[in-house]
Amino acid sequence: MRARAIRREPVRDRAQHFELGERGEALAIDQLERLGYHIVAANFSLPIGRNTRDAIVNAEIDVVAYDGPTLCFVEVKTRATAEFALPQTNVDLRKRRQIARAARGYRRMMGLAASPFRYDVVTVVAKPNDAHPRIELLKGFWTDEQLRKRNWQEQYWD
């Protein structure tokens, strides 16, 4: 059974960036499968807390897959052009923390807390009618250690 990005019915006057994002996710899944990843889930969403207005905050993991024995949480970033900024620049600290919290919840729900895991990013640069998009896999883009708060009680200035 192969997981696929959610395909929605065409909606009149739908923004192009939604279509580009969905196309990018589908291309990323195809690329990951070609590289030997076993896709487990696509567009996995989980509530991770509440904001200052007490509204529920959800985090989404674009792709959950296995690369051999390693569970991979993959964020897909799609752009029509990389002239202004690379797609991976939008995976900022806030986004990394959201994905890490959702990944922690996923691992807990599935009983995989002790399993090896990593965070990958797939970048897709594809114009709307481009037959040959540029797809790049960035393995181990960040770690949980990079998200931890620093312990300033140790002797910093010595």
Q: What do these predicted ranges mean?
A:
Residues 1-52:
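Acidic-basic catalytic patches of nuclease active cores, encompassing PD-(D/E)XK
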Residues 34, 56-60, 69-71, 86, ...:
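Short connector loops at helix/strand junctions that flank enzyme active sites
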